[in-house]
A protein has these predicted regions:
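Extracellular beta-strand/beta-solenoid scaffold signature
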Residues: 6, 10-30, 43-55, 62-64, ...
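Short, ordered coil/turn segments that flank beta-strands lining enzyme active or ligand-binding pockets
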Residues: 141
Length: 174
């Protein structure tokens, strides 16, 4: 496996420059990629994985993924966008964008959510502290989700089964 670490210069941060996507796994044309046994660490990007495109097939398997949004980052408004921290998928139910068997730690503000429009999120362990949970994902199964979530854990998801959820509702002070 490989290791991916987000790095930012102080000059870029002072100028307000932050990447939107950390790793793009498919965008245009035909993409078939599998990421296994990797370590991913990020802080300043908006979303770790971009997995969009009609012909994208992207699987993240058995990875250690951490994103902890610094307190100095501007708050997100969940009414003005999906604001996923982990991934934005292609909204297909064919298993083409999947994160599975991974250990995931996410920490963000009240306007952040775990993921949006993935085909599947399955068999993962998620430790979270953020505003929203999993949204518009086709299959959510066999996950252990613990920590703190302000709003719904599952929103507009189908195929939600066999998940162990131990979360507290809270409000992140701004």
């Amino acid at each position: 496996g490989c290791s991916f670490y987000e790095t930012q210069t102080q000059e870029a941060l002072d100028a307000g420059h932050r990447p939107v996507w950390f790793l793009t796994l498919g965008q245009s044309g035909t993409t078939d990629v599998r990421m296994e046994d990797c370590t991913v660490r990020a802080e300043y990007c908006e979303t770790i994985f971009r997995m969009v495109g009609d012909k994208t097939r992207a699987v993240v398997d058995n990875c250690d993924i951490t994103m902890k949004q610094p307190d100095s980052m501007a708050e997100h408004d969940m009414k003005k966008g999906a604001n996923p921290m982990l991934a934005r998928g292609n909204d297909r139910a064919d298993g083409s964008t999947v994160i599975q068997n991974s250990r995931i730690t996410l920490s963000g503000d009240n306007g952040r959510r775990i993921c949006y429009q993935l085909s599947a999120l399955k068999g993962n362990t998620l430790d979270v502290s953020l505003g929203c949970g999993i949204a518009s994902t086709k299959e959510v199964s066999g996950n252990t989700i613990r920590g703190r979530i302000r709003h719904k854990v599952f929103q507009d998801c189908s195929g939600v089964e066999n998940n162990k959820v131990d979360v507290r509702r809270f409000s992140i002070l701004g």
